[in-house]
A protein has these predicted regions:
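Residue-level recognition of single "structural anchor" positions
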Residues: 13-173
């Protein structure tokens, strides 16, 4: 016994297959873009030390100002790239009062997530998770934080400055 399908069903199936192929090709392209972007980023910022150095340079490019007493005098803090106000003794890390404040993942991974979100069109948190080998919900949470920052829901000029410098160095490679 043979089952005959109406010709409209075959046309719909062909349209579905065509749409599915386009979606898969776009997904492969995004995965390739994400992979290339991640490799380029790792050449510029390979470890936490270089990420903290870049963050501190961008954060205090106009000089240190204590967030507690507004003093501009400081000395080196306990941890690397932190500063201690000589007036009130408050220690401020490079990540304090930035989008990277209280970030539970390494700072270089957090910067890489921000870089991927800003430079790869429509990248999913699943793809970021796969690229960086970090839990999906961690990537989702930080991706959401970056997107809120980009939408103007928080006043983070620092993120834009950091990403512009990284983009400039990546383009030189």
């Amino acid at each position: 016994m043979s089952l005959l399908l109406p010709s409209s069903t075959i046309v719909l199936d062909l349209k579905f297959v065509s749409l599915f192929k386009r979606i898969m090709n776009k997904t492969k392209l995004n995965n390739l873009q994400a992979s290339l972007a991640a490799n380029n980023f790792k050449k510029v910022i390979p470890d936490q030390e270089s990420a903290l150095k870049l963050l501190s340079e961008k954060k205090w490019h106009n000089g240190f100002v204590c967030s507690k007493c507004n003093s501009t005098n400081y000395c080196r803090g306990k941890s690397s790239y932190s500063r201690r106000c000589t007036r009130c003794k408050k220690i401020e890390s490079a990540t304090a009062n930035t989008i990277f404040h209280r970030c539970k993942i390494p700072i270089n991974n957090a910067m890489e997530i921000a870089y991927l979100v800003c430079n790869v069109s429509a990248i999913s948190s699943y793809e970021i998770s796969r690229q960086l080998d970090i839990r999906h919900m961690t990537c989702y949470g930080f991706q959401k934080k970056v997107l809120n920052c980009m939408d103007g829901k928080s006043e983070e000029d620092l993120l834009q400055n950091i990403l512009e410098q990284v983009q400039g160095e990546v383009s030189r490679l």
